[in-house]
Swiss-Prot record:
EC identifiers of the protein: 5.6.1.6
Ranges for region Interaction with GORASP2: 1387-1481
High-level lineage: Eukaryota, Metazoa, Chordata, Craniata, Vertebrata
Species this chain originates from: Ovis aries (Sheep)
Cytoplasmic compartment spans: 1-77, 147-195, 244-298, 359-858, 940-990, 1035-1095, 1152-1481
Name of the protein in question: Cystic fibrosis transmembrane conductance regulator
Amino acid sequence: MQRSPLEKASVVSKLFFSWTRPILKKGYRQRLELSDIYHISSSDSADNLSEKLEREWDRELASKKNPKLINALRRCFFWRFMFYGIILYLGEVTKAVQPLLLGRIIASYDPDNKVERSIAIYLGIGLCLLFIVRTLLLHPAIFGLHHIGMQMRIAMFSLIYKKTLKLSSRVLDKISIGQLVSLLSNNLNKFDEGLALAHFVWIAPLQVTLLMGLLWDLLQAFTFCGLAFLVVLALLQAGLGKMMMKYRDQRAGKINERLVITSEMIENIQSVKAYCWEEAMEKIIENLRQTELKLTRKAAYVRYLNSSAFFFSGFFVVFLSVLPYALLKGIILRKIFTTISFCIVLRMAVTRQFPWAVQTWYDSLGAINKIQDFLQKQEYKTLEYNLTTTDVVMENVTAFWEEGFSKLFEKAKENNNNRKISNCDTSLFFSNLLLGTPVLKDISFKIERGQLLAVAGSTGAGKTSLLMMIMGELEPSEGKIKHSGRISFCSQYSWIMPGTIKDNIIFGVSYDEYRYRSVIKACQLEEDISKFSEKDNIVLGEGGITLSGGQRARISLARAVYKDADLYLLDSPFGYLDVLTEKEIFESCVCKLMANKTRILVTSKMEHLKKADKILILHEGSVYFYGTFSELQNQRPDFSSKLMGCDTFDQFTAERRNSIITETLRRFSLEGDTSVSWNETKKPSFKQTGEFGEKRKNSILNSINSIRKFSVVQKTSLQMNGIDGASDEPLERRLSLVPHSEPGEGILPRSNAVNSGPTFLGGRRQSVLNLMTCSSVNQGQSIHRKTATSTRKMSLAPQASLAEIDIYSRRLSQDTGLEISEEINEEDLRDCFFDDVENIPAVTTWNTYLRYITVHKSLMFVLIWCLVVFLVEVAASLVVLCLFPKILLQDKGNSTKNASNSYAVIITSTSSYYIFYIYVGVADTLLALGLFRGLPLVHTLITVSKTLHHKMLQSVLQAPMSTLNTLKTGGILNRFSKDIAVLDDLLPLTIFDFIQLLLIVIGAVVVVSVLQPYIFLATVPVIAAFILLRGYFLHTSQQLKQLESEGRSPIFTHLVTSLKGLWTLRAFGRQPYFETLFHKALNLHTANWFLYLSTLRWFQMRIEMIFVIFFIAVTFISILTTGEGEGRVGIILTLAMNIMGTLQWAVNSSIDVDSLMRSVSRVFKFIDMPTEDGKPNNSFRPSKDSQPSKVMIIENQHVKKDDIWPSGGQMTVKDLTAKYIDGGNAILENISFSISPGQRVGLLGRTGSGKSTLLLAFLRLLNTKGEIQIDGVSWDSITLQQWRKAFGVIPQKVFIFSGTFRKNLDPYEQWSDQEIWKVADEVGLRSVIEQFPGKLDFVLVDGGCVLSHGHKQLMCLARSVLSKAKILLLDEPSAHLDPITYQIIRRTLKQAFADCTVILSEHRIEAMLECQRFLVIEENKVRQYDSIQRMLSEKSLFRQAISPADRLKLLPHRNSSRQRSRANIAALKEETEEEVQETKL
């Protein structure tokens, strides 16, 4: 960034904004980069502004019982705000004085008024000077108010962020991300946009008073006729606005539904393609779009009428003011033209300025109150522990996440009992819900310095809550805690901050090279880092999305280990690691590197418990066991089945299996208002979430997608509740910290299962606390793997043993503190946060306009029709001009002596009738023609939007994954949300306004030129100057706007990133650093925004300066040209004076149109994406010579066996190479192997080795080379749809879209209910579905939030069974499954897919034991492909990964092979006898 010229600019340069010329010149000549932007002044920096407001707010808090944020803002900004308001008022006063001089100039043309004639030239000079003064006053005032609004926004942005970092976890559990984003975007943007209008709340009444006084002098009491009409018009516009909001509110729900489905489709586009659901998803979305567009059209028609009312009101204001006076008393022309000019100013004040000002104050005060409430919420308090460096002690500790919740629970229970609920097992409900129970009860333990405490337990037992209490995030209600204050923490779900790998590991602690390298080695990160071109200095953005889940987990662990602390809290740090890597890291890092440190490890692995010094097992918040491992074996032999739910599926009753559904549904009913009767609550509780969650329309932010979707929250018209709404819904709050996707999920659900869904979903919100505890398991599968897939290879060879040394003994002198860098490179910040720069020209090309016009054939005809109507209007005006002088001359000859003696031209009663008829006739004609012109235009433009959405949706669904992998999910969603909203809402009305204003200006110029041809000579250069100036400015402004838009994203990204890692931030004490980073992001945005405001004001001022020159020319041509009549001069000067505002408005509208057309350019860019196979709408039509001749896929019908393909499921893979993007590095190279029909093959490899990639390659979802044959049919001989239908898929990322059970299982409606129920029986889903009202017609929302992860996996399994596929692909199907669902899947695979080929990628050893062959992938290639017997007998990855106990389980498999002798079996048995108890909890 460069030094700003503003620092050394002179007063004149600042007044005329000339200091912006260098950036305007550079932007016109070349593309602007971030380095071209100017540094902001110190007065605009977030640090100074936040410190100033924070100081005043603290003063307000300290001095008053009811602190008001507006008082703090007043003390910071009031005097400057008032100063610019007074200047603005003086500029507006000049508009009221101008018509007075105009009237004097017109009066000077009266032959009897020679005195006035002599000073006409001076009157003209005075009129021109008024325009110059107005220009010099208004623009600095408007810019100053915009500047103050920007500063207020920055200060409050920072204040909200600082408060967010201080909020207690209890408060965070009650606030959704959508509410925070709403505070930072929808609310605070009002200050930027509206502060310039705020002063009109007092300026407009003063202006109206002054104008009414001047009009009284002209028309006396008849003045109030026009004012009354304007007041009625303002009320009418308010009514139209209310009607428009009604339609928009109705439409918002439809937009929600469409965006929900679209978001789910985009997030799961791989699954959509794998299931061949493209046509089904397109049909669902288009049906929703149709309903949405009906309401869009209604809202657009109302908006059009509202906008048109302003344009056409000018006729009637003058008509109602002048006509009564003229009929009774007669009127001179001077009064007519003066009245017209006064009425134009009056109309603007009454119908635009004052209503806008009132709305601005209403919105701003509402936003300030919301922020004020937020700033007074409870803060996180660091607990005062009894500090010690020798041990950690808990004595009889009990804790609640929600204080006072037991009373609320009992009240709800009593209310429900009083209602005598029928057909509901209330005892089961309340026994499972456990709302009023503490999360931890009577916890006591003690560990000495240097010991390892392993904490185990079932899902929701309170393991994470225990760590939170030690960290101070959860305040104990009873008991004592004693430990050292120096804590290091590793979260269960890895959190990566924007920055380099080194920054993430060091995390502000002083850099020690030896310690750093030791930690890198212990956490198995050496080889990963070596694969990156920039090594550990590679910048990671968006939560480390370029890394695999295992890499993120190891970086998070390395961060915790690097810090020198007294107590290390490790919350399930090995969740995403393969068995071998986990084993090595546990040994080298936890057991050796940290041997002298006190460690608390949350785990579910028996081998970890065996090596722990002490074991603490929790169950339902209580201590189930505390002691050593040997004591555990002796005292609690049943602990495995008790805690982990390992009983077999058949031993559970149907009631217990279905308890998760029963509890979830009834919890929804309980969450309603307790004052509502049960019947009123129950009925909506089973329909769409939005129906029973009217209070909870605020957004739900998915932990993965929230960062990418803020443009949706900011730009769409969706409604959000404020922060204050959260306090009204105590029953909605979550109690447990453990998300539903935790490995080893228990039988009974948590009462707060985390909902995942996009930003704009209605219904149950996800709190910030849920966001912090959400899994990011799918982040590594994002589209950004294109940049990291080649680096995710990991060595299969174990690392060398780490020397048993104490790396923490090498403490540097400054190591006790945190080293916080104040210097943050803006370029690095851009790498961390910014989206890819769009490859769109700075100015919309003519080709885009032409293509837009030709999208729908009717648009061209409508534009021609508009031109015809305009010509008719101009012709009508010229006819009036021709008739007008004749009427006046005729009347002049017939006038009485008294009349002729007073003024030369007087309109008598007779001529008034003629003028009345002409005036009203022209007004009616223009009004009718305007309606005929505008309504078809708006209607057609919405039709064009409909067509573009349809084409874009088709293009995305048909695009190859290699193209979609290069796009960010949020970017795709923005096209369907923000850009389509622009095409639907903003563009039609903006185009209408531009065309209307352009035609008004052209018509006025034509009339003036006809009346005085000399003026046409001045008009030509003025028009040329406008066109050149617009083109010059547009290049720079659009680039600055784009940079500003890109600069906004890091602010919200940083907010969510901070929230997701808030516990880590507090544990490491990194809040100051993150505040600094947030301020840097704010400053970066401010630099772009301030420069955009400055250049915009430069442009606006130049427009007015050109017009002032034009008006001076018109004025003096009219005055100096002899022979002009009074009426002609009046028309010329009135039109010329009032062209100014219209012309400026028209030029601004043209810039707005160009800016909005960038959305059209982006949509066209998506429409032009290539299609899969380069052929849109592929359909398979085999030629006569194609072989085999009877190739087909089973779809709806049962066919003869001779016609079925595939029939056996044999696969042959030859030289398969796969890439994620065109031109990218190969992820898999030269893969060749074959699979026999009905065989089960397991895929083995380290984390990130390419197992999931291989499954995607089978489905042709990647850029692939080579050949695969299924039962002799090559994938090149049939279409993609046919090829993919040969596979059944259970993806790692489960896809449940918003719709009924039936739609989710059978979106094409191919199967009967009997078939679906039969399959539901097979996979164990019948009892689940039957619990819901409507059964198969029950509508699932929020990604199936009422279903457990296991049930969602069963849904995928049911889809595969329905597809009758012969080849089944399973990608980590047991990840995050509870044992019950896992047993169901294993049973279904054995029964329903007994004769199918199964390819399985799995970390769970038990599942792999059922495979006949294994494919080992290492370094992008097949390293080994063999049977289970050979894999166990050789040194292989499989043998390293499998435990001796699991090898013992494989004895039956090996014994079945006749090639193995009993001696080998005996040797294996002897080898594993000692470790036979080593199993997974």
